């Protein structure tokens, strides 16, 4: 007969009548170690001598103690022997090996580590048939650096802080981690002071003969020159605040997580843990050589899955054990008391929830989507990602292929679809808490680990030991057999033998998103989300919420989805990419690719396409070098017979001609809103950068466009405009909030204009592949009332001549539409002069363009470059806020902001803090938003959902260890709120590196320096 294991706030062995690390007071319990989350005031305990002594120091209560030396076997019951083995976690930590004649051997590890610590007994690996093991760091991400390296880094941090006349403060648990640090700092010869609680427990260690290097109890008067070791919970206390010049460091395995420094609000974080990392978990299983494994704590589901993939029977205790893509094992049975999906109540006005009865392994199941997404995340290799998606997508029907492709881009709907879920963070959190039955503190802890709403929700939902309809966890523990599979309960409640696990389909999830978008008000949306979360597994919930928040964070760009679609459908990649650029609907592209109708996708009016983007360059010299290198490469390719300049190409016939083509087309970069204007017959629509319709906010522009005689799609900058020049962006923002009516005085109060610089479509003809010089010529004629085709305008070396720039426009349109002025440059000095002139006119900088380039929607290539050197700016996302001072003491006006690291899953890295630049009205609006989207509170500081993009100006950028990005901005100030941008569009770590390199070489030395005054007229 196998072991019976019940799980509810600890593990219970009914065949023995003993608990293992019970969380609440019980009659009898084994206590693996003395950390507070493993102890309680039990009547009778089994533990090691070290644990017993530490418990007496921490937990003053009467109890019966069975203290067992390591390696000594005694009878726990008449027919079961017990042996304690060192776990290596902290001093006295023990594993419990049970040996029963009928049930076999069971090893419970408690918390453990294989790494040999300096203040704990080394971990043993006794053989057992069944192992119940902790898997705190059960993901491949958690492979710790060599201990010697980490300790050296900690010592360096301490030495540097003391050298700067500061006091290094190291945060580690007062029991275990602090003693490890104390021993580890001996070689660095650093004097150490201990927090009073840490000091008390260290004295207990010494009673067992453990020797430490010299240390003192904390003394504020003599603290300078010392390292202070104290528990993590003191980091926000007056104890730390009163230490002069303190610099703090968190010592934890979670330092491996992105943003750990920010999450812990410390100056540094070092990955030293008393738990086994991923590799040691695998080594432990190999050494113990069990027949089956039950996992718990941390990433239990993921590690159990890893073991199954290696051929070992393994299941996560208290969590859903859904099978991943390609796993052939039998799934766990349904638990007793579980409601079937179709019987669960709906939160939507009493209407029954969708049945979600798709077989688990059906190609269109959402579980298969989740497995494919996890497989993509698991590999850093582009070709492997594409192969995973190719195989997944190839098995789907055209409609399902379209739905999956949309979800893979992190969206519920195609980009051009105007529907919005408006499922905010507070609704998501509330739904997760209600379904999981956990506290808000549990949710915060999960968010700390992942810094991702979806991953945090998945982890919290995985903690629920019972599904809705079961008895409460406290009244009916989950019963597990030796395989870790839940006992199905009485035969009457078991599903028929022919039944198979079911899940939601892709179509089910798409219908959910449609219902959520159509639902009115947060209450209705909450009901829908709660209903859906109750129907699906934690892993499925993880990706559901990732899609809701708009970012899968699996290392997948839309370009890779396009490559996978092409491979799955057997279509040319360029055809798929062109179709995606034209229609902005990846679902439509997927369906067309599968049905061989890609050629039918054409650029059409009122279907906005993504804007062509420019790559940033920090200096004029960099722009010249970039274009020169590009032209030389093109020329060399043609001479070698491997290149084709194509229609309108500026590539020379020989490589010798390349230097003559260094003439560069320049346009001024305005501080406005990127805008597409679509006009056909009597209809006009305006679209913003994020492809939203903004016609209602600018009806005067729409009316003016009706005067144009041709149908067209134009690309330009929408500006607040008066007396022939652009007004500050703040003036334009006053128009952005007004819609739903045609204010007669609006145009006079805040006049607006569009400065056009490109023409994409004219009278049914796509111009995307035409060279820029041709598109510009047609744009000029359009605004003059004549858009008939003409021969290519003459220009020096084939470059469009300045004559393309008209002196006057159609009088009816001159106040509403203009052509972006074009100038030309040969050298970096020319570009510098043009830049200063643009700055003098109050504009942001320059755009440098290749006049032979086509228009590539949504692509950030090298045909367009932007220079914003002086008064440089970065688009960043707010991750933390604080209350201000003085008149702003009651509003959140101080903002900590971050850029993204595109090379590491777009994790957010802080780069600075700013508190000036916004109006009182804007600050008041943002205060309300941030109060509603606060993740956690640390005194005056609030961690907020990273959903607000701002543009930050600064004087220069330089390397710095102060922020997670490794860079700091000099005199940052907020230029504007970027409501037109999402966090996925903020600037990157690579951009910071380029700007810092330019600053170091003098390229941004002029940043913050005013351009010279203009010559008087």
UniProtKB/Swiss-Prot annotation:
Active-site residues, record numbering mapped to chain: 669 (n6-amp-lysine intermediate)
Disulfide pairings: none
Residues at which ATP binds: 667, 674, 689, 717, 860, 866
Domain of life according to the entry: Bacteria
Catalytic reactions of this protein: ATP + (deoxyribonucleotide)n-3'-hydroxyl + 5'-phospho-(deoxyribonucleotide)m = (deoxyribonucleotide)n+m + AMP + diphosphate
EC identifiers of the protein: 6.5.1.1
Presence of the UniProt keyword Magnesium in the record: yes
Keyword Nucleotide-binding: yes
Cofactor: Mg(2+)
Region feature (DNA ligase): 364-1017
SUPFAM superfamilies associated with the record: ATP-dependent DNA ligase DNA-binding domain, DNA ligase/mRNA capping enzyme, catalytic domain, Metallo-hydrolase/oxidoreductase, Nucleic acid-binding proteins
Gene Ontology MF, one: ATP binding
Location of the region described as Disordered in the Swiss-Prot/TrEMBL record: 326-352
Residues covered by region (Unknown): 1-363
InterPro entries per UniProt: ATP-dep_DNA_ligase (IPR050191), DNA_ligase_ATP-dep (IPR000977), DNA_ligase_ATP-dep_C (IPR012309), DNA_ligase_ATP-dep_cent (IPR012310), DNA_ligase_ATP-dep_CS (IPR016059), DNA_ligase_ATP-dep_N (IPR012308), DNA_ligase_N_sf (IPR036599), NA-bd_OB-fold (IPR012340)
Keywords: ATP-binding, Cell cycle, Cell division, DNA damage, DNA recombination, DNA repair, DNA replication, Ligase, Magnesium, Metal-binding, Nucleotide-binding
Any single GO BP term: DNA replication
Role: DNA ligase that seals nicks in double-stranded DNA during DNA replication, DNA recombination and DNA repair.
Family label: In the C-terminal section; belongs to the ATP-dependent DNA ligase family.
Protein name per the record: Probable DNA ligase
Native organism: Opitutus terrae (strain DSM 11246 / JCM 15787 / PB90-1)
Primary gene name: lig
């Amino acid at each position: 007969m196998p072991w019976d294991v019940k799980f509810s706030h600890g593990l219970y062995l009914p065949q023995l009548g003993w608990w293992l690390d019970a969380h609440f007071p019980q009659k009898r319990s084994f206590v693996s170690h003395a950390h507070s989350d493993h102890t309680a005031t039990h009547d009778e305990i089994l533990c090691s001598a070290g644990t017993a002594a530490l418990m007496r120091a921490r937990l003053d209560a009467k109890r019966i103690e069975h203290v067992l030396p390591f390696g000594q076997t005694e009878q726990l019951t008449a027919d079961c022997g017990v042996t304690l083995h060192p776990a290596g976690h902290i001093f006295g930590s023990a594993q419990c090996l049970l040996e029963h004649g009928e049930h076999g051997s069971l090893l419970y590890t408690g918390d453990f580590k294989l790494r040999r610590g300096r203040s704990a007994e080394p971990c043993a690996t006794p053989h057992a048939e069944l192992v119940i093991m902790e898997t705190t760091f059960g993901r491949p991400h958690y492979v710790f650096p060599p201990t010697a390296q980490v300790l050296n880094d900690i010592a360096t941090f301490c030495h540097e802080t003391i050298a700067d006349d500061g006091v290094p403060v190291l945060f580690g648990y007062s029991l275990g981690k602090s003693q490890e640090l104390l021993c580890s700092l001996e070689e660095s010869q650093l004097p150490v002071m201990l927090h009073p609680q840490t000091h008390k427990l260290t004295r207990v260690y010494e009673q067992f003969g453990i020797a430490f290097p010299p240390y003192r109890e904390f003394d504020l008067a003599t603290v300078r020159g010392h390292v202070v070791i104290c528990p993590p919970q003191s980091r926000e206390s007056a104890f730390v605040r009163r230490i002069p010049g303190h610099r703090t460091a968190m010592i934890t395995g979670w330092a491996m997580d992105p943003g750990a420094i920010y999450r812990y609000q410390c100056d540094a974080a070092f990955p030293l843990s008393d738990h086994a990392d991923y590799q040691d978990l695998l080594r432990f299983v190999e050494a113990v050589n069990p027949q089956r494994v039950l996992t718990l704590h941390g990433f239990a589901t993921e590690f159990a899955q890893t073991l199954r993939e290696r051929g070992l029977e393994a299941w996560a205790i208290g969590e859903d054990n859904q099978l991943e893509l390609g796993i052939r094992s039998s799934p766990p049975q349904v638990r007793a008391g579980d409601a079937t999906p179709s019987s669960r109540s709906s939160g939507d006005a009493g209407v029954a929830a969708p049945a979600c009865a798709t077989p688990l392994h059906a190609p269109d199941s959402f579980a298969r989507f989740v497995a494919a997404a996890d497989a993509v995340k698991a590999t850093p290799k582009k070709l492997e990602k594409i192969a995973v998606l190719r195989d997944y997508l190839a098995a789907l029907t055209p409609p399902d292929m379209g739905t999956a492709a949309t979800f893979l881009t992190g969206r519920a709907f195609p980009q051009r679809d105007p529907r919005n879920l408006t499922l905010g963070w507070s609704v998501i959190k509330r739904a997760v808490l209600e379904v999981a039955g956990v506290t808000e503190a549990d949710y915060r802890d999960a968010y700390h680990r992942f810094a991702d709403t979806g991953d945090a929700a998945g982890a919290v939902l995985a903690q629920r030991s019972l599904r809705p309809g079961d008895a409460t966890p406290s009244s009916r523990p989950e019963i597990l057999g030796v395989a870790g599979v839940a006992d199905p309960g009485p035969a009457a409640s078991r599903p028929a033998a022919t039944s198979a696990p079911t899940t939601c389909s892709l179509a089910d999830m798409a219908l959910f998103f449609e219902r959520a978008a159509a639902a009115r008000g947060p209450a209705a949306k909450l009901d829908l989300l709660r209903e859906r979360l109750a129907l699906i597994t934690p892993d499925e919930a993880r990706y559901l919420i990732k899609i809701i928040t708009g970012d899968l964070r699996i290392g997948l760009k839309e370009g890779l989805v396009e490559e996978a679609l092409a491979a799955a459908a057997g279509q040319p990649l360029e055809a798929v990419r062109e179709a995606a650029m034209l229609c902005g609907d990846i679902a439509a592209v997927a369906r067309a690719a599968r049905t061989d109708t890609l050629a039918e996708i054409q650029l059409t009016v009122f279907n906005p396409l993504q804007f062509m983007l420019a790559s940033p360059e920090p200096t004029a010299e960099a722009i010249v070098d970039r274009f020169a290198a590009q032209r030389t490469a093109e020329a060399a390719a043609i001479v070698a017979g491997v290149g084709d300049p194509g229609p309108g190409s500026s590539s020379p016939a020989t490589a010798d001609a390349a230097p003559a083509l260094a003439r560069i087309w320049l346009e001024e970069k305005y501080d406005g809103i990127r805008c597409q204007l679509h006009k056909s017959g009597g209809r006009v629509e305006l679209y913003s950068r994020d492809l939203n319709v903004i016609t209602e906010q600018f009806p005067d522009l729409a009316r003016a466009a009706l005067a144009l005689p041709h149908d067209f799609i134009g690309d330009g900058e929408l500006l607040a405009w008066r007396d022939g020049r652009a007004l500050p962006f703040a003036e334009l923002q006053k128009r952005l909030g007004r819609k739903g009516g045609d204010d007669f005085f609006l145009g006079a109060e805040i006049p607006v204009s569009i400065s056009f610089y490109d023409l994409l479509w004219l009278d049914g003809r796509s111009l995307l592949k035409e060279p820029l010089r041709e598109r510009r010529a047609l744009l000029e004629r359009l605004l003059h009332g004549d858009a008939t085709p003409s021969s290519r305008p003459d220009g020096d070396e084939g470059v469009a001549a300045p004559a393309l720039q008209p002196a006057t426009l159609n009088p009816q349109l001159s106040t509403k539409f203009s052509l972006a002025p074009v100038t030309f440059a040969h050298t970096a000095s020319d570009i510098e002069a043009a830049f200063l002139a643009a700055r003098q006119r109050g504009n942001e900088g320059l755009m440098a363009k290749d006049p032979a380039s086509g228009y590539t929607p949504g692509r950030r290539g090298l045909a367009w470059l932007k220079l914003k050197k002086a008064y440089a700016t970065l688009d960043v996302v707010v991750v933390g806020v604080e209350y201000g001072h003085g008149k702003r003491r009651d509003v959140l006006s101080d903002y900590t902001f971050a850029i993204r690291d595109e090379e590491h899953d777009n994790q957010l890295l802080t780069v600075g803090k700013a508190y000036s630049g916004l109006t009182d009205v804007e600050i008041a609006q943002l205060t309300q938003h941030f109060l509603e989207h606060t993740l956690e509170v640390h005194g005056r500081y609030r961690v907020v959902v990273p959903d607000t993009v701002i543009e930050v100006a600064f004087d220069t950028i330089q390397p710095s260890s102060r922020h997670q990005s490794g860079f700091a901005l000099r005199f940052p100030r907020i230029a504007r709120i970027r409501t037109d941008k999402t966090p996925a569009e903020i600037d990157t770590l690579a951009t910071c590196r380029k700007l810092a390199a330019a600053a170091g070489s003098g390229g941004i030395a002029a940043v913050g320096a005013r351009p010279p005054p203009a010559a008087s007229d």
